[in-house]
């Protein structure tokens, strides 16, 4: 009987800890992107786009890293809305592309995305306390030209003329 109680207690502990591990590893793409006037910065280069990305999380440092990943995700799959005199930026690919090339994008968003993005206001981020944690906003600059080139070279993004053949 004692062995049975010990076994049941051990199994409950195992299930509880397994759920905690799985929850920590899952990171969803919960973010907002807004296009803002650049002010004094030079943003006339068509190869780059500068915008604000807001992500949600529990720790500020972790959420900052998530902001960078979400910014690249936003450019690739959602695009940017127009704001003021700045026009909208269309997404590089459709939202179904992520599920079609799931393995590629899971690997890409582990670290490869970092070479296409930089913070324009390092250390100067917006942090808002919310009911479920923190909302962290960072102004970022994404190199769209290099990102498109990488996706084309890897066979993920197709040229219009390739699609017509």
For each predicted feature, which ranges?
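Domain-level marker for long, solvent-exposed, non-transmembrane regions
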Residues: 18-165
């Amino acid at each position: 009987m004692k062995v049975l109680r010990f076994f049941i207690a051990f199994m409950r502990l195992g299930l509880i800890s397994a759920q905690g591990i799985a929850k920590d590893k899952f990171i969803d793409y919960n973010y907002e992107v807004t296009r803002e006037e650049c002010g004094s910065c030079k943003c006339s280069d068509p190869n780059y786009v500068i915008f604000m990305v807001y992500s949600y999380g529990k720790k500020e440092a972790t959420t900052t890293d998530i902001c960078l990943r979400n910014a690249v995700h936003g450019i690739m799959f959602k695009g940017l809305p127009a704001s003021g005199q700045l026009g909208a930026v269309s997404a590089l690919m459709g939202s179904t592309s992520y599920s079609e090339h799931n393995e590629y994008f899971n690997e890409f968003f582990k670290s490869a995305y970092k070479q296409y993005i930089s913070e324009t206001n390092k250390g100067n981020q917006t942090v808002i306390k919310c009911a479920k944690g923190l909302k962290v906003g960072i102004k970022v600059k994404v190199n769209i030209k290099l990102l498109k080139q990488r996706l084309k070279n890897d066979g993920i993004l197709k040229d219009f003329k390739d699609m017509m053949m």
